[in-house]
Amino acid sequence: MAKLTVKDVDLKGKKVLVRVDFNVPVKDGVITNDNRITAALPTIKYIIEHGGRAVLFSHLGRVKEEADKKGKSLAPVAADLAKKLVQEVVFPGVTRGEQLEAAINALKNGEVLLVENTRFEDVDGKKESKNDPELGKYWASLGDGIFVNDAFGTAHRAHASNVGISANVDKAVAGFLLENEIAYIQEAVDNPVRPFIAILGGSKVSDKIGVIENLLKKADKVLIGGGMTYTFLKAQGIEIGDSLVEEDKLDIAKDLLAKANGKLILPVDSKEANAFADYTEVKDTEGAAVDPGFLGLDIGPKSIAKFDDELTGAKTVVWNGPMGVFENPDFQAGTIGVMDAIVKQPGVKSIIGGGDSAAAAINLGRADKFSWISTGGGASMELLEGKVLPGLAALTEK
């Protein structure tokens, strides 16, 4: 990566501004998944161990009006982070003003402060989300000219707390998490060890058109699963029963299939049910077609075997999107089968592109078997599409 990283700057005695991604699920004041906090620890620890004074910024959820602030404070995150660091995390509970400035100026080397939810600034004119220049300048003024972006999950957004601060400091550098995310995902797409196989699932073709187009150019094969399977099948004239379909995307699906030159591999059977929720019958289809009155909710056993075969010998695998409704035990065999097929390949670099795939790997006990699990669903999708991420582009060149 041709950008400066946190290792390239002198941190001692400096108030170092750090954008982290602490957008974690909080229920009744309790954090239910702390993965993103844990992922930020190496960068935070590096800064404080090298004598920096870490001033952390993060958003939590969406905040559009005053009422949305309820339950969106970063207070529980500050408490959790303090436990993980085994030291106090100063939390003034505001996003600007004298109280915040005094607390930052009182920091000593090796101390940590967390600014309140940056999206609280969205209540009055979306200042954070629309990258208000004055807000970016103000937040930048709270530090000593160094900004560390370690929030891959928001790198595809141009917000005041990443791009805005970057524009107003001497050096904007990447943290370890951001550096690793780019190294794994971009390297996999731009310079993969081959065979390189991409696996795309999820419900909608519309969400993945750009990704499919880019990966058809880069990968040796692209395997398709999940709900979007049925738009591709219908585009080929195959009966899909009551399965999910995007009628307005059938022509795009046909076009992608025509351009793919055999690289796009579709399921050859499905696990179908006679309703999405209150079903009374679940069975495997004979072939690719789904029976009338049924809908496909997972890839079937023949498809699992086919995908296992296609993955044999793969050296780079990027997976984004589950194969079925994995939250339901009746429809998780496809996702489990594909995960197991990926991780058993000798010497494979296996990457999960965040979002539902990451949740599936964690919930189904396979997370530790992958080379890398991205912390940013949207950002990893845009990297897979070949897009430039604003948060990354704003960093200082080496």
Curated annotation (Swiss-Prot):
Keywords: ATP-binding, Cytoplasm, Glycolysis, Kinase, Nucleotide-binding, Transferase
EC number: 2.7.2.3
Reactions that this protein is recorded to catalyse: (2R)-3-phosphoglycerate + ATP = (2R)-3-phospho-glyceroyl phosphate + ADP
Gene3D superfamilies: Phosphoglycerate kinase, N-terminal domain
Protein name (record): Phosphoglycerate kinase
An example Gene Ontology CC term for this record: cytosol
One annotated GO molecular function: ATP binding
Disulphide bridges, residue numbers: none
Family designation: Belongs to the phosphoglycerate kinase family.
Binding-site residues for ATP, renumbered to this chain: 208, 296, 327, 354-357
GO biological process terms on file: gluconeogenesis; glycolytic process
Subunit structure: Monomer.
Organism the protein comes from: Streptococcus mutans serotype c (strain ATCC 700610 / UA159)
Residues given in the record as substrate binding sites: 21-23, 36, 59-62, 119, 157
Subcellular location: Cytoplasm
Pathway: Carbohydrate degradation; glycolysis; pyruvate from D-glyceraldehyde 3-phosphate: step 2/5
InterPro entries in UniProt: Phosphoglycerate_kinase, Phosphoglycerate_kinase_CS, Phosphoglycerate_kinase_N, Phosphoglycerate_kinase_sf
Pfam family, one: PGK
